[in-house]
Amino acid sequence: MSQEFLDFELPIAELEAKIEALRSVSQQDQQINLDDEITRLQKKSAELTQKTFANLDAWQVSQMARHPNRPYTLDYIEHIFTDFQTLAGDRAFADDQAIVGGLARLEERPVMIIGHQKGRSIKEKVKRNFGMPAPEGYRKALRLMQMAERFKLPIITFIDTPGAYPGVGAEERGQSEAIARNLREMSMLKVPIICTVIGEGGSGGALAIGVGDKINMLQYSTYSVISPEGCASILWKSAEKASTAAEVMGLTASRLHELKLIDSIIEEPLGGAHRNYDTMSNNLKKRLLADLADLDKLDQETLLDRRYKRLMSYGYC
């Protein structure tokens, strides 16, 4: 996968381009030794990357959460779990491709996985509806959760959506009802639920699979009631104020952790999760295993009581 850089990474991109150019020259003419210069530029690039990512603002984090090369749910399933078996359809209308789910093993332990799925190519983006589920997606998710409860399997969800699909058809089929039902039912499921925001956590579309016993966020993910552009359009009548909106919305993992709305921040590799899928997957896997170990210590009554109190505390300081 070719590396893509965001606007604020352009100085890094320029250094990386120089490195690639020198490598190309070195490969074409074996008598030219450019190793020292390449090493010097690599060191400079690493230092600049470290400096850049040490001070990201909320808008830059928002851009990172949407990075086109960022790992999606199916990427984490491939890197973390084994024996994944896809389960499809809501048994009522259709199989929404914006939500994926199924049975898998985490270190030999059977679990149920559910997550939003975006696409990379134009064709796949359309197929996945840009990660925006319709009601049938949330009903599929609920069906899988209820199946997990019957078989006493922990539920692991991965959140990455700009929001629930706002189309006319989705509204006609009961989008708000599907989201509300998931909130209610998830609060009462008698098995452990671990939710992790891996990219965008957009409004009710995220919360519909985000009611859990442990709520985690990747370092450069976001979680908010509306996008920065949407907020700016409402408050300042201009999407150009998105960077200002991002700062005041408190949508970053660090801010939400301060507010005690999430439990853990999962560190990303230098430069973001897309720079190293293996490292990111290992960090996420460690967090999931630790969370499962913690939740295994709780009896069912305590588990449900804690989860319900967490849900009811949202919006209160």
UniProtKB/Swiss-Prot annotation:
SUPFAM superfamilies: ClpP/crotonase (SSF52096). It is found in: Cytoplasm. GO terms for cellular component: acetyl-CoA carboxylase complex. GO terms for molecular function: acetyl-CoA carboxylase activity; ATP binding; carboxyl- or carbamoyltransferase activity. Belongs to the AccA family. Acetyl-CoA carboxylase is a heterohexamer composed of biotin carboxyl carrier protein (AccB), biotin carboxylase (AccC) and two subunits each of ACCase subunit alpha (AccA) and ACCase subunit beta (AccD). The gene is accA. Component of the acetyl coenzyme A carboxylase (ACC) complex. First, biotin carboxylase catalyzes the carboxylation of biotin on its carrier protein (BCCP) and then the CO(2) group is transferred by the carboxyltransferase to acetyl-CoA to form malonyl-CoA. Pathway: Lipid metabolism; malonyl-CoA biosynthesis; malonyl-CoA from acetyl-CoA: step 1/1. Its EC number is 2.1.3.15. Residues 33-294 form the CoA carboxyltransferase C-terminal domain. It catalyses: N(6)-carboxybiotinyl-L-lysyl-[protein] + acetyl-CoA = N(6)-biotinyl-L-lysyl-[protein] + malonyl-CoA. Keywords: ATP-binding, Cytoplasm, Fatty acid biosynthesis, Fatty acid metabolism, Lipid biosynthesis, Lipid metabolism, Nucleotide-binding, Transferase. GO terms for biological process: fatty acid biosynthetic process; malonyl-CoA biosynthetic process. This is Acetyl-coenzyme A carboxylase carboxyl transferase subunit alpha. PANTHER family: ACETYL-COENZYME A CARBOXYLASE CARBOXYL TRANSFERASE SUBUNIT ALPHA, ACETYL-COENZYME A CARBOXYLASE CARBOXYL TRANSFERASE SUBUNIT ALPHA, CHLOROPLASTIC. It is an enzyme of class 2 (transferase).
